[in-house]
């Protein structure tokens, strides 16, 4: 029986086969969270590892998406995505309306957990 994770791995590998796909975010090129285990088979040449700067990461993703790249941008916790709200709401969301073109961005967001380590209230505000 296939698991949800198996299907995520399958979909990430499928997207990685496309020449214009790039993976952006924290712990993409360097493993460190459960999301990074879904792209272990993806070439490091298709990854841009970022520090913790969520708004800039989303801005980069929007910009890359404008160049016809298919961007999969990783946010290890959903509450990190809130920090990128400006780029998401004022740019990515409005891009097609403003220009007539699509910006191809897929946002992957993780849900906080407390196992094996409790990350505290800032990182599991589920």
Regions found by a protein language model. Give the residues of each.
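Thiamine diphosphate
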Residues: 1-126
